[in-house]
């Protein structure tokens, strides 16, 4: 049935075939196909037991475990192919924009997400604070880098964060979240002829991150905490204190994505010595002030806010990855197997993103809206049709119902 599903979807068949050289033999490649297709089409929990049920006459959970935990296939090659396919489409889109003389900002959003777990025996699992739950929960925290450009959106890197106490217990070096973010920035190969804006929340704009951006020729747009020091016009104050000394007439108003903002901006230095533009802003009608800084001093407050809002694409990815692609469904104890599961989940996401871009490019309506969920539901529907067609074909050949059960539902 796996072969029938893959062959009935030409785009899926070509996509999976691009990864063939990462596997030493055909059985490994078949396991890869089964794993990725299972992630894409299964409607239940995408743990090994669920993935084994995703395809009639599918792989045994034990064989899937051996595939991710023991078999010797090239995970780096898999990631290289994933990245090249996504990056190739992005470069083509940038070339088309350049022919029309359109300057295109490229956003590299750094963020982290907590994947809740229940098994305390999982390697590197720990208690982390969950903002959504308002308490500490057991799980893994993943720091990610996400590329956002011309409507395209996909991860460029991800690293598992481990608390310092956990690292000491495991005898491995501790790496902070900003240091993991630095590693992602260092590994990122910028797109030619573009300006890269690194987007972060207030957890990440350390001196090292600012230095790394400056070294790579990137600009930073980041939220900062209200107690961050900002020096301008002879004053060296926490950013929240500027509201207390500014006259009412100092504030302006801008509109971003149909929302009105009250803003004040100034150029000055952070305590690290870096020159930045500070944008103090709040949505009209709300009390809470938010504070953004950027190292691109030429940007207007309106553009800074607009660029920063692109960061919410990452939240959309986290939601899809957890709810529809099984990011948090793994139950393996071994970290090596977990990292391979996440890699294969990223491959499944790449297929959906590439197909989403194809659908948008061929849409008659220039304002068409296509989501990853739309593409995934189409694939799931077509896969069910393939399964039904296979049953019909076997029945036409005279196989009994019991024999069909044994072939497809044993």
Model-derived segments and their meaning:
Residues 62-66, 71-72, 132-195, 276-291, ...:
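Electropositive, glycine- and tryptophan-enriched low-complexity nucleic-acid-binding patches
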Residues 51, 104-118, 145, 197-205, ...:
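Short, conserved catalytic/metal-binding motifs centered on acidic residues
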């Amino acid at each position: 049935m796996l072969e029938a599903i893959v062959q009935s979807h030409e785009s899926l068949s070509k996509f999976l075939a691009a990864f063939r050289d990462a596997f030493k033999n055909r059985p490994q490649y078949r396991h890869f196909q089964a794993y990725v297709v299972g992630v894409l089409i299964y409607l239940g929990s995408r743990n090994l037991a669920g993935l084994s049920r995703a395809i009639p006459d599918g792989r045994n959970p034990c064989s899937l475990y051996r595939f991710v935990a023991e078999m010797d296939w090239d995970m780096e090659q898999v990631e290289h192919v994933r990245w090249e396919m996504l990056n190739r489409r992005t470069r083509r889109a940038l070339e088309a924009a350049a022919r029309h003389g359109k300057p295109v900002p490229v956003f590299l959003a750094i963020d982290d997400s907590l994947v809740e777990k229940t098994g305390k025996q999982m390697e590197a699992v720990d208690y982390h604070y969950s903002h959504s739950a308002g308490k500490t929960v057991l799980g893994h925290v993943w720091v990610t880098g996400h590329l956002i450009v011309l409507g395209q959106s996909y991860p460029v890197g991800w690293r598992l964060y481990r608390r310092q106490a956990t690292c000491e217990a495991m005898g491995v070096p501790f790496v902070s979240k900003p240091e993991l973010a630095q590693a992602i920035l260092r590994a990122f190969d910028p797109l030619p002829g573009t300006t890269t804006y690194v987007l972060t929340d207030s957890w990440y704009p350390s001196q090292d991150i600012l230095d790394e951006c400056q070294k790579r020729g990137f600009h930073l747009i980041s939220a900062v905490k209200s107690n961050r020091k900002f020096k301008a016009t002879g004053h060296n104050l926490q950013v929240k204190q500027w509201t207390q000394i500014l006259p009412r007439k100092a504030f302006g108003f801008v509109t971003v994505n149909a929302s009105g903002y009250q803003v004040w901006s100034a150029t000055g230095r952070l305590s690290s010595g870096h020159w930045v533009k500070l944008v103090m802003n709040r949505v009209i009608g709300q009390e809470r002030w938010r504070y953004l800084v950027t190292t691109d001093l030429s940007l207007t407050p309106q553009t800074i806010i607009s660029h920063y809002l692109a960061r919410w694409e990452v939240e959309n990815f986290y939601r899809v990855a957890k709810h529809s692609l099984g990011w948090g469904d793994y139950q393996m104890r071994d970290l090596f197997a977990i990292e391979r599961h996440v890699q294969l989940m990223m491959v499944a996401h790449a297929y959906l993103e590439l197909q989403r871009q194809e659908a948008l490019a061929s849409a008659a309506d220039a304002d068409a809206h296509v989501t990853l969920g739309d593409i995934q539901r189409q694939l799931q529907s077509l896969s069910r049709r393939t399964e039904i067609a296979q049953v019909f074909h076997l029945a036409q050949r005279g196989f009994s119902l019991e024999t069909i059960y044994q072939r497809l539902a044993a």
